[in-house]
Each structure stands twice: as structure tokens, then as C-alpha cells.
Amino acid sequence: MGKFLATLILFFQFCPLILGDYSPSCCTLTIGVSSYHSKPCNPAQPVCSWTLDLLALSADQALQPPCPNLVSYSSYHATYSLYLFPHWIKKPNRNGGGYYSASYSDPCSLKCPYLGCQSWTCPYTGAVSSPYWKFQQDVNFTQEVSRLNINLHFSKCGFPFSLLVDAPGYDPIWFLNTEPSQLPPTAPPLLPHSNLDHILEPSIPWKSKLLTLVQLTLQSTNYTCIVCIDRASLSTWHVLYSPNVSVPSSSSTPLLYPSLALPAPHLTLPFNWTHCFDPQIQAIVSSPCHNSLILPPFSLSPVPTLGSRSRRAVPVAVWLVSALAMGAGVAGGITGSMSLASGKSLLHEVDKDISQLTQAIVKNHKNLLKIAQYAAQNRRGLDLLFWEQGGLCKALQEQCCFLNITNSHVSILQERPPLENRVLTGWGLNWDLGLSQWAREALQTGITLVALLLLVILAGPCILRQLRHLPSRVRYPHYSLINPESSL
């Protein structure tokens, strides 16, 4: 009896710890080698929420696809709508019918290989009637281009489901598994809502290693650069490995396929190598060879210098430019006035020559008319002499000739206005105003000078300020810390 009571007391003492350690506090979504924790959820708080990026999910699934020869859809397009297909571990009986809605289809069972499908048909084994998920109660999601928000009821956590994009001819499928789990005691490194401890924490905390590398980088640049870390998925991370350490020939499981792997035979780290990299398959494997280090892409950028407070303009430069502009305007006005005066005199001389030519042509025309009258008079006299033979033309047995002189062109030439009135010598406006020629030209010159002065006052300070800040706007090149062509 005493042993039973002691056992019962120990059970009640450790029961809260056991229940607290294994009671689920969230739902973990797994795709490829990456996992994403939902916001805290449990039977009392049954809504489990995720905020995901479809491009990152595609990169994670490419590391460990659910089916061989998967035809992936790399460039996600905004015009393609997203659909959700729940899956079940045990395929239910098919009795026909099933739940159907615009953003949700009937549950299907995963079947390889993918063949490509559209959203309104079940892509694998066809629709089933029971069990099914209700779209609003069990699962719902919102989509903004490649950003996805999923809300899943806690009772459905533990079942896999897939996301489908309506793109005929492709299989843009993301196959996701869910299981109840506990939130990690500390925040995951770098990637939010992702449990990467099984890859990044083989020995000492991985975050301290990254901080040590950042500190060494800052010291090497004498704290003149900024270290920028790219918060991306594991598929875009880099690996430094030592080719001097051999990899065991025993079979091992690939854990990560990095986007860049660089050999570093002469690199000395402040700590030991943490992972095992196999150069033959270009992947991080599970063997404990410790010849590599995983790190995210990070780059160096120069520290921007603080510039002095910019003034509106330099007064000396403004007045200097204004004086130069005014001098140029005065010189241009005087030159223009002189050219206008010389042009006026030239037009006057040309007009005099034209009038003299016109008078000469008119006199010649009048003389020609008199000659024509004399010829007509002689013709009439000869016709009277040869009246008996039938006239002069019949007596000569020739065709009669007549003189036709027109006066229209000479009339048009006399009616032409003076050349000075037909040629524009100013701005093409009526600047008469009852003033003399020099007064009109002086008025035009003054208006030109005022317009130039206003233009310099308005645009001069802006142009000078832009010229002063032009050297400080030269961009510095972006240097990557990991350069494939550099010798580490």
C-alpha cells in the first residue's frame, strides 16, 4: 500500500511536466527540408495561421520533391489563381459527388507522376464524397500574387494538403505536410517561422558563429563597411568547405543543396568546421566529417558619409551669372538693333531698285504698244493698196499674222506693295504703337533682357545646386564577400 501511494504521488508530481512537454502548442508545416511553425494554436485556440511565400516554397520543395521528374513551374504569375487540395493518409471510398466551391476542390489522394491539370478537376484519383474539409470552417486562405496567408483548423493539423496553380500543361504543385508540435524555446536563426535547428545547430549555436564572422569582417574593413545579410531560404545559401578533409565513403543522406559552394583550403576559422560537404554530389550530407560551413549570402556596402547642410545657392555665383546674362543680353540687343537697322536700309535699297525696274518695264511695255499700233496702221494701208487682189495676205499668198499684247502681268507688278511691308524684320508682331523704329527696337531689347534675367533668377540656383551635389552622387560598386573568382 505504501509503494502504491508513493508511485501515485510521483505520477501527480511529474504529470504536469509530461503534459506540458508533449502538449502541442502549434502546427508545423513541412515542405522539402524546411519547416514552418504556425502561430500558437491548440484545441482551445483552434486557428493555426501561416504567412508564406510561394517562391520560397518552390525553392524548398526543389531540394526534396515529393515525386520524381516533377515538372515545376518556376515563374509564378499574378494572373494564375491558387487552389487548395486536401489529401488523406487513407483513401476513402468513392461514392460520387463531393464538396465543391470556387477556391476549394474535393479531397484527392497523391499519385505520381504528375500529369498536369486544371483547377476544376481532381488532378490525381478523382473526387470523393466523404470526408471533406469545409472551406470557411476547416481551411481558408488569401492570396496576393506570391504571398499566401493560410488559416487551418487545429483538428485538420496532421493531414497533408497541396496547393495548385491553374496553369494547364504544368504541375505547379506545393505538397505540404502538417503535424501538431511545440514552438521552439528560442527564435530560429535568420529565417522567420522556420525550424532549421536540425541543420544549422550540429555543435555550438550557429547564431554565435555568424556573429563572429560578421565581427571579423567588420574588423578587417576597419569598420568602414556595412555587412548586409540576405534573409532567404536554404536553397540560396552558400557553403565554404575545405578540400583537405576527406568525406567518408559510407552512404549518407543529402540534407541541403546550396546555390554556391566554394573551396577554401587556406582559410582559418575562429572555430571548427561544422558540417560535412560532399563535392561529388554538391550537397551537405549527414556524415560527421566536419569540413564545411553554411552561411547565408551577405555582402559589403560602404558606410555613407554625412553630408553638410545644403544651402539654397551661392549669392556671388548667382549675381555673377546674372551679370553675365545681362551683359550678354545687352550685347545681343545692340547687335540685334544694328542688324535690324542694316536690314531695314538694305530692304529700302532693294525696294528702290525694284521700283526702277518696274518703271523701265512699264515704259518698254508702252513703247511696244505704240509699235503695235504703228504696225496695225501700216497693215490697214497695205490692205487698201491690194484691195483688188483681196488684201495683203492674199496677194502675198501667206497666212495673216496678228499681234496680241496682254497687260495683266504689268498690272500685277505695279500693284505689288513695297518690299518693306512684305518682309518681317522684327518679332512678327504689330509693334508700331505710334513709335519710331529705334523706339520699337529698344522696347523689344528691354523685354528680352527682363525675360533673360527672370530665367536666370528662377533656374540659376537650382542648376548650381545640382552641379555642386553631382560629385557626391557617384555610386560606389557593390562588393560581394563571397566571390567565386577570389582566392580564399
Curated annotation (Swiss-Prot):
The record marks 312-313 as: Cleavage. A motif (CX6CC) lies at residues 393-401. Keywords: Cleavage on pair of basic residues, Coiled coil, Disulfide bond, Fusion of virus membrane with host cell membrane, Fusion of virus membrane with host membrane, Glycoprotein, Host cell membrane, Host membrane, Host-virus interaction, Lipoprotein, Membrane, Palmitate, Signal, Transmembrane, Transmembrane helix, Viral attachment to host cell, Viral envelope protein, Viral penetration into host cytoplasm, Virion, Virus entry into host cell. Residues 21-442 are extracellular. It holds the Pfam family TLV_coat. One of its GO terms (cellular component) is membrane. CDD domains: HTLV-1-like_HR1-HR2. The surface protein (SU) attaches the virus to the host cell by binding to its receptor. This interaction triggers the refolding of the transmembrane protein (TM) and is thought to activate its fusogenic potential by unmasking its fusion peptide. Fusion occurs at the host cell plasma membrane. The transmembrane protein (TM) acts as a class I viral fusion protein. Under the current model, the protein has at least 3 conformational states: pre-fusion native state, pre-hairpin intermediate state, and post-fusion hairpin state. During viral and target cell membrane fusion, the coiled coil regions (heptad repeats) assume a trimer-of-hairpins structure, positioning the fusion peptide in close proximity to the C-terminal region of the ectodomain. The formation of this structure appears to drive apposition and subsequent fusion of viral and target cell membranes. This is Envelope glycoprotein gp62. HTLV-1 lineages are divided in four clades, A (Cosmopolitan), B (Central African group), C (Melanesian group) and D (New Central African group). Residues 313-333 are annotated as: Fusion peptide. The keyword Flavoprotein does not apply. InterPro entries: TLV/ENV_coat_polyprotein. A motif (CXXC) lies at residues 225-228. Residues 376-392 are annotated as: Immunosuppression. The mature envelope protein (Env) consists of a trimer of SU-TM heterodimers attached by a labile interchain disulfide bond. One of its GO terms (biological process) is symbiont entry into host cell. Glycans are attached at residues 140, 222, 244, 272, 404. Residues 340-385, 397-429 form a coiled coil. It comes from the Viruses. Residues 1-20 form the signal peptide. Specific enzymatic cleavages in vivo yield mature proteins. Envelope glycoproteins are synthesized as an inactive precursor that is N-glycosylated and processed likely by host cell furin or by a furin-like protease in the Golgi to yield the mature SU and TM proteins. The cleavage site between SU and TM requires the minimal sequence [KR]-X-[KR]-R. The CXXC motif is highly conserved across a broad range of retroviral envelope proteins. It is thought to participate in the formation of a labile disulfide bond possibly with the CX6CC motif present in the transmembrane protein. Isomerization of the intersubunit disulfide bond to an SU intrachain disulfide bond is thought to occur upon receptor recognition in order to allow membrane fusion. The chain crosses the membrane at residues 443-463. The lineage of its organism: Viruses, Riboviria, Pararnavirae, Artverviricota, Revtraviricetes. Changing residue 329 to A: 25% loss of transmembrane protein cell-cell fusion activity. Disulfide bonds join 225-228, 225-401, 393-400. Residues 464-488 are cytoplasmic. It comes from Human T-cell leukemia virus 1 (strain Japan MT-2 subtype A) (HTLV-1).
